[in-house]
């Protein structure tokens, strides 16, 4: 049987758990037992977005494609080690193991796929776009387009039918790019 846990949020670089008075119970879909508690307190989304823009985005943009891809691979390996806990949580939502398989292992496989895309890029935080274009008669100067990571944050809204795959697919593409 699942243990009762409190689901925390990672905000401003730290884990935050709801207070007991703000915690809402989550119930097992089959037997109705409390399996976890989540917070329902108001969050300061403006400060969360500011932190994401100034700290999270800044640090992520410093990483090269190789570093970002390897980060995705490490995350996939970590999640794979803990996949049985995901199956247990999925069972509590009413899903069978075969229902959950495509979501859990497909989502982790998606991380591995995006991690492998790093091989298509150099070991720098930008990508070359096209060839060098000589612009002067003597070839003394020219142009080269580059693709750089966008500044800002991404807000993901995920469907309930694939909670693992949906989230991992969305974050993988943005962390790599």
Which stretches of residues belong to each language-model region?
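Conserved small-residue-rich beta-alpha loop and adjacent elements
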Residues: 126-177
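N-terminal Rossmann-like NAD(P)+-binding subdomain of aldehyde/semialdehyde dehydrogenases
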Residues: 2-139
């Amino acid at each position: 049987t699942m243990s009762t846990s409190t689901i925390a949020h990672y905000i401003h670089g730290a884990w935050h758990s709801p207070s007991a008075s703000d915690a809402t119970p989550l119930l097992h879909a089959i037997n109705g037992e409390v399996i976890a508690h989540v917070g329902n307190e108001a969050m300061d989304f403006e400060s969360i977005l500011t932190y994401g823009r100034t700290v999270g985005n800044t640090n992520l943009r410093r990483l090269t494609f190789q570093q970002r891809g390897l980060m995705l691979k490490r995350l996939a390996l970590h999640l794979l080690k803990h996949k049985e806990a995901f199956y247990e949580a999925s069972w509590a939502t009413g899903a069978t193991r075969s229902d959950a398989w495509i979501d859990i292992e497909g989502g982790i496989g998606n991380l591995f796929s995006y991690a492998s895309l790093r091989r298509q890029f150099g070991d720098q935080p930008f990508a070359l776009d096209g060839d060098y274009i000589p612009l002067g008669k003597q070839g003394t100067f020219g142009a080269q387009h580059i693709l750089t990571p966008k500044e800002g944050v991404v807000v993901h809204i995920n469907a309930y039918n694939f909670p693992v795959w949906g989230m991992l697919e969305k974050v993988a593409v943005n962390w790599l790019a």
